């Protein structure tokens, strides 16, 4: 095989990974302190909400969506939940999502 074919196949592989969001996986250890600061006030330190009408992560509420959909939701906010676009980076939000997934 010549080098241009190998390089082309490698490029296609990397682009496929980027397109699927595989590179965006969050780190739950990095997400924990961010969750404690930004989310625990309403969702509780272990994912059990302190306020009525808020997702209970311990019960899996709100977690059955793909990471990209949750990322969009956290950035925009809805109802009493504020949006975090411009406050948290996409990587930080993905870290928080990874941490939240450890509750269920």
What residues fall within each predicted segment?
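Bacterial N-terminal signal peptides that target proteins for export
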Residues: 1-11
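Sec-dependent N-terminal signal peptides
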Residues: 10-18
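N-terminal signal peptide c-region/cleavage motif recognized by signal peptidases
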Residues: 19-21, 26
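Short pre-active-site segment immediately N-terminal to redox-active cysteine/selenocysteine motifs
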Residues: 27, 35-41, 46, 77-80, ...
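Gly/Gly-Pro-rich "capping" loops immediately C-terminal to redox-active cysteine motifs
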Residues: 28, 32, 44-73
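Conserved beta-strand positions that form and line the central face of beta-propeller blades
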Residues: 56, 80-83
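Periplasmic c-type cytochrome electron-transfer domains
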Residues: 68-81, 100
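C-terminal capping alpha-helices of c-type cytochrome domains
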Residues: 74, 86-104
């Amino acid at each position: 095989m010549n080098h241009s074919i190998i390089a082309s196949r490698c490029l296609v592989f990397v682009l496929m990974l980027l397109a699927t969001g595989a590179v965006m996986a969050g780190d739950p250890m990095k997400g924990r302190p961010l969750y404690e600061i930004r989310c625990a006030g309403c969702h509780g330190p272990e994912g059990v909400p302190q306020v009525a009408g808020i997702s209970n992560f311990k019960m899996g509420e709100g977690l059955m969506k793909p990471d990209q959909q949750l990322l969009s939701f956290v950035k925009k906010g809805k109802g009493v939940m504020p949006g975090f676009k411009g406050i948290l980076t996409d990587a930080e939000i993905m870290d928080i999502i990874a941490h939240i997934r450890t509750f269920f």
